[in-house]
Amino acid sequence: MAVKRLIETFVPENYKIFLDIDRKTKKIKGQVAITGEAKDTVVSFHTKGLHFNKVRAFSVDTNFIENEEDEEIVVKIGETGRVTVSFEYEAELTDNMMGIYPSYYEVNGEKKMLIGTQFESHFARQAFPSIDEPEAKATFDLSVKFDEEEGDIIVSNMPELLNINGIHVFERTVKMSSYLLAFVFGELQYKKGKTKSGVEVGAFATKAHSQAALDFPLDIAIRSIEFYEDYYQTPYPLPHSWHIALPDFSAGAMENWGCITYREVCMLVDPENATIQSKQYVATVIAHELAHQWFGDLVTMQWWDDLWLNESFANNMEYVCMDALEPSWNVWESFSISEANMALNRDATDGVQSVHVEVTHPDEIGTLFDPAIVYAKGSRLMVMLRKWLGDEDFAAGLALYFKRHQYGNTVGDNLWDALAEVSGKDVAAFMHSWVNQPGYPVVTAEVVDDTLILSQKQFFVGEGVDKGRLWNVPLNTNWTGLPDLLSSEKVEIPGFAALKTKNNGKALFLNDANMAHYIIDYKGALLTDLLSEVESLENVTKFQILQDRKLLAKAGVISYADVVNILPSFTNEESYLVNTGLSQLISELELFVDEDSETEKAFQSLVGKLFAKNYARLGWDKVAGESAGDESLRGIVLSKTLYSENADAKTKASQIFAAHKENLASIPADIRPIVLNNEIKTTNSAELVKTYRETYIKTSLQEFKRELEGAVALIKDEKVIAELLESFKNADIVKPQDIAFSWFYLLRNDFSQDAAWAWEKANWAFLEEKLGGDMSYDKFVIYPGNTFKTADKLAEYKAFFEPKLENQGLKRSIEMAIKQITARVALIDSQKAAVDKAITDIAEKL
């Protein structure tokens, strides 16, 4: 079924929306008048789950047909031209965090409810009839009445104009897409401030949280708006910017224009006990959503195939913004650790979607929001483009883009045109190969007969069909005398020895600062030279060596045994970035290590030796004035040291737990998950799991909740695991938004994996009903694909999911997961013996 475009028959100009919402009955009564241009005598509007009592056109009752399968109502208006079509209807609050839905929480044991909205991507139709397409921009006059109680407030995209007999009337919005309309009502507390330009900024949350938890997000929001106004040279166009933390939320956050909504863990920060990682995460999420107020809201993609125009740029700009506001955080290191790593891994599987991808079925719209591609890869491409253009031209091009297309819709070439006009470079020619093609290249660098040969070829992990794709690869080398771009399959540069002398004999490396989306396979002396200088290289280059060698091993280009052999080169590293690279590599090597084997003992010894110096340097206690990098690194070092069975570390972890056992939340946040995990591993106590679960239910600290989720999943007790799995059906214990994470923690552990997998299969109907429209739904397809590593599990996965391939919302994820598991099984079979030997040998030598 092709995607039907309703804007082709009706172009909306204005919506007048009145909603009467009753929380107790969960009923909605709606009246909507849509004024616009009818291009046909029969027009259609999107609708889902709405029950219509009356439809009028030209002030006369008219016939209509409700087409549930196509999610539309067909209205016979009899004439073309400007018309107002009005609807009276009834609906119910949804129960899957889409449309208009309830959020549940408790304050001092009393259960309460907030009402919020989530209309992206195409869920406005569950709240009111509409042309629910991004191109169909219009203004909105919103009025809401609800069962208001003392202490309740309501907020929306625009300021409240007046309150007439309990009807809250909001100012008319600017011209915008339907998916950006939003409102929230209930008992909320808030703090407010103003930007230098006079924009009112507010942070809102339920009273389940300390009001002080609003201070950090409010400060970040104010400073981010000020940064973007300056960087984009385009004023923030609305009178206010509200930021609301919702107890139940499908995604991380949503960029509703002027009324941004968040999952609580993505916005609120415990002022007394928060990690630097938590602050950085919250700050980048807020900066991401505020970047959208220009990229996505002011200028919106014409159709969902250009979703990357929203998400790729917002993902890039969150780092640009935070690097400017908090330079000591070194957020570009975090970018390499998370975004680059995620993109390189996902994008190496044949069949992955491109950044720009055609939408041929309505159910495919939700699949576009692939965090590894549209967000991570797309932002990596924008980082590459910004470096290629230079920051000044990049920013000036964006300013021109906003000026030219504000309140309108665009396609990718509109952005390339603006950047090209400012920079004088052919941006479209440079970017098309990256945005329109899936995958990325491996650049092979080798010297043959004094000739440096650089060649590119699409990189695959697992089986892949080479279609001869080529990219415009920015070499970004540390040497002079080499070309800027590799656009052909191969380039040969003679006189390598002389060229090396000209560059003072230093080792050659490509992709400086890890800013372009490719990896490098250095052959022979080129790799030897690079490793010989490893201590003097920039931290990001060291990280790249680990990143690229790991991926080459994963693809079978080299052996993981080869990668194990370079580990001794990194024993003296104090950098958070480099040690994270080591940690990621260790996680990959764990695939080959059988539990309770001699190889595991050798591997534990090796890991302990790799992190011994940093354990001695950092210890357990935060030091006043220490860097953000050291604070972040401590958790990695302690985790790996405990994995190595270090007696001192295990004793210290148990002592810290004992000192805080009456108030587990008071454990210093930077070491808290380490301590919680260790106690479960050490005691394997069902009673301790019970304590953790009771604490989980009572606490309002979302980061702490996530830590407790991870810790209880480490239990090795079949009865307790069964109880944990069954609790996922009880929303009073585990909220639907958290089921996927909680379940994954059990799936990834060998002891509980079979039980978690069996639970998913037995409860698929429950997951479909509860999470079918939710952004976490396909995680139950993706997570097993990221985890399973045996032929038996591959067969079971196929048997369960292949019959579901007709579900267009899951199809690509299922196909990708099968390829990933197949590749992982083959990799372990082919390399395990060599890797086990290398681990044993290096552990003895180190």
From Swiss-Prot:
Subunit structure: Monomer.
Species, as recorded: Lactococcus lactis subsp. cremoris (strain MG1363)
GO CC terms in record: cytoplasm; extracellular space; membrane
UniProt entry tagged with the keyword Transmembrane: no
Protein's name in the database: Aminopeptidase N
SUPFAM superfamilies reported for this sequence: Leukotriene A4 hydrolase N-terminal domain, Metalloproteases ('zincins'), catalytic domain
Function: Aminopeptidase with broad substrate specificity to several peptides. It has more affinity for oligopeptides than for dipeptides. It plays an essential role in the metabolism, it may be involved in nitrogen supply or protein turnover.
Location in or out of the cell: Cytoplasm
Binding site for substrate: E120, G252, A253, M254, E255, N256
Active site: E289 (proton acceptor)
Enzyme Commission number: 3.4.11.2
Cofactor annotation comment: Binds 1 zinc ion per subunit.
Main location: cytoplasm
InterPro entries: Aminopeptidase_N-like_N (IPR045357), Aminopeptidase_N-like_N_sf (IPR042097), ERAP1-like_C_dom (IPR024571), M1_APN-typ (IPR034016), Peptidase_M1 (IPR001930), Peptidase_M1_aminopeptidases (IPR050344), Peptidase_M1_dom (IPR014782), Peptidase_M4/M1_CTD_sf (IPR027268)
Catalytic activity: Release of an N-terminal amino acid, Xaa-|-Yaa- from a peptide, amide or arylamide. Xaa is preferably Ala, but may be most amino acids including Pro (slow action). When a terminal hydrophobic residue is followed by a prolyl residue, the two may be released as an intact Xaa-Pro dipeptide
Single GO BP term: proteolysis
Record-listed Zn(2+) binding positions: H288, H292, E311
Requisite cofactors: Zn(2+)
UniProt xrefs under CDD domains: M1_APN-Q_like
Site positions (Transition state stabilizer): Y375
Family: Belongs to the peptidase M1 family.
Keywords: Aminopeptidase, Cytoplasm, Hydrolase, Metal-binding, Metalloprotease, Protease, Zinc
Molecular-function GO term, any one: metalloaminopeptidase activity
